[in-house]
Every structure is written in structure tokens, then in C-alpha cells.
A protein has these predicted regions:
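Beta1/beta-strand and adjacent pyrophosphate-binding region of the FAD-binding site
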Residues: 5-20, 36
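Glycine-rich loop(s) and the adjacent beta-strand/alpha-helix scaffold that form part
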Residues: 179-254
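Core beta-strand elements of the Rossmann-like FAD/NAD(P) dinucleotide-binding domain
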Residues: 7-10, 174-183
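Short glycine/serine/threonine-rich phosphate/pyrophosphate-binding segments
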Residues: 21-24, 194-195
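Generic hydrophobic/aromatic pocket-lining and core-packing "Φ" positions
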Residues: 24-25, 104, 228
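Conserved N-terminal/central alpha/beta ligand/cofactor-binding core
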Residues: 34, 40-152, 158-161, 197-200, ...
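Aromatic pocket-lining residues of Rossmann-like dinucleotide-binding sites
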Residues: 28
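Short, hydrophobic/aromatic-rich segments at coil-to-beta transitions
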Residues: 166-172
Length: 258
């Protein structure tokens, strides 16, 4: 079957279990490749931070199914500039913005449902398409589709290190187990859950305090940045500002990880 099964060398090894990993696995399987996906979390916590999302911001030049009015490319781009403070890659950003207009058909093909516009909520129904059942339903739909397409999925399988020779992927290690593949997709998330790395990125304030010590992680506990740090050690280029984040106000009594 698909879960926790042994496998011959796959065409594609996908490391991660959230939205990006699932999309990569689904598209590889659609193209006829054999796929093995390694998810660090147990099955009940699968999906990374994608389980905490609820909608997709979509460009559209005219009303589209669950979207009202219009949300053109340039307005979307200007909104992105506001929230990033201008620290973004315009070429890649515009690629994503344009694709947001058409990706819902592919998502529906893999079992994702969108809820109709809510009465009195036109300000978000114009820009955002909401997943029926939220991010957890999105993740579950993709996992069901992946299993139907023959993607092998292993849970509780955190990758500790990669074997990289001359800039090329050779193998991944889950503990002492060595897993080879013809190609590898790294989609294992950032370092949002790594308190030590967050401290390093945010530093100390003028009172000598560490702001990151007060952070509560609205998301998975499994995004430790292990492979990100591994790739940086192997010469991968850094990009972006490590202090950029999507932050929200939550109850101070909330657990460290949600």
C-alpha cells in the first residue's frame, strides 16, 4: 500500500508533508513518476503549517466562481509590497500572482472544495477563496489523492541529513536508514519551530532580552530548519530576511505550539 511501506528506489523523493510537498508529489505522480514522500510528523499531525491555513488569495480580472468583482494583478502586487516592505522577488511574485488565477481547477481535481462567498464579507470574497473545512480539509484531500495516485507516504520519518556530492543529491537519511532517489524535492519548511534559531535571528533588545523567547508558535512543532541549515552548510544561497514572518496576536495562555 502507500503508508509506511518499503519501496524500491523512487523516481522522486519528496521531503516534507505540507502543501508544497503534496503539490510536488501529486504533479510528479501525474507525470508518471514513482514518488516517495517523507513526513516528519505522525499521521495525526501531518501537513505542517498548511493545516493552519484557510484560504488562497487569487488574482482575477472579473468575477470567478467563488470570487466577486475583480482583483487585478497590479493591485495584488501592491498589496504584497505593503506586507513585505518591498523585500520580495518581483519576477517570482508575479509568476505566483498570475498562477493564482487558474490553480483552483487543479486543486478541485484533487478533492479540494471552496465555499461560496459569505454574505456581508465582500471585502474578503473579492480577494480570497476559502477552503471548505479549512487547511486541514485541504491537506486531507491532497493526501487522499496522493494515495490514489500511488504515492508512497511515510510518517514519523524526519530526515536528519542529506548526502550531496558535487552539488547533486545522492541520498537522504532517516536515522541510520539511507534512501536514494533519482531526484529529490526539499519541501520541509523553514525554522519557525526552532527556538534557538529564532533567538539567533531576532537577537536581543536594548534591555538585553530575547524577543523570540516570548514567541508562541501558531503552527507545527516539526519545522526545525534541519535541512535548511544543512543546505546552507553545503553552499546554498541565502535569500530574504530571517526576521520576516506572518505574525498574529494570540492568547498568551496558548501552548508553545498549536
Amino acid at each position: 500500500m502507500t503508508t509506511q511501506a518499503s519501496t524500491k528506489q523512487p523516481d522522486v523523493l519528496v521531503i516534507g508533508g505540507g502543501n508544497a510537498a503534496l503539490c510536488a508529489a501529486l504533479m510528479a505522480a501525474e507525470a508518471g513518476a514513482t514518488v516517495l514522500m517523507l513526513e516528519a510528523a505522525p499521521r495525526e499531525w501531518r501537513g505542517g503549517n498548511s493545516g493552519h491555513t484557510r484560504n488562497l488569495r487569487c488574482m482575477h480580472e472579473a468575477p470567478q466562481d467563488v470570487l466577486v468583482e475583480a482583483y487585478p494583478e497590479e493591485e495584488y502586487w501592491q498589496d504584497l509590497l505593503k506586507v513585505t516592505g518591498g523585500i520580495t522577488n518581483e519576477k517570482l511574485a508575479r509568476l505566483v500572482i498570475r498562477a493564482s488565477s487558474t490553480c483552483r481547477d487543479w486543486m478541485r481535481k484533487h478533492g479540494v472544495h471552496f465555499q461560496p462567498p459569505l454574505s456581508g464579507a465582500l471585502h474578503v470574497a473579492r480577494t480570497n477563496a476559502f477552503f471548505m473545512g479549512g487547511g486541514k480539509a485541504l491537506v486531507n484531500a491532497y493526501y487522499r489523492s496522493a494515495e490514489k495516485l500511488g504515492v508512497q507516504i511515510r510518517y514519523n520519518a524526519p530526515v536528519d541529513k542529506l548526502d550531496i556530492k558535487e552539488g547533486r543529491f545522492v541520498a537522504a537519511y532517516v536515522g541510520e536508514e539511507r534512501i536514494t532517489a533519482k531526484t529529490c524535492v526539499l519541501a520541509a519548511g523553514g525554522f519557525e519551530s526552532n527556538r534557538e534559531w529564532l533567538r539567533e535571528a531576532w537577537g536581543q533588545n536594548e534591555r538585553g532580552e530575547w524577543p523570540a523567547d516570548n514567541f508562541l508558535i501558531r503552527g507545527t512543532q516539526f519545522n526545525q530548519g534541519v535541512l535548511l541549515k544543512h543546505m546552507l552548510a553545503h553552499g546554498a544561497d541565502r535569500i530574504g530576511d530571517p526576521t520576516q514572518a506572518h505574525m498574529v496576536a494570540i492568547d498568551a495562555r496558548a501552548p508553545l505550539y498549536d
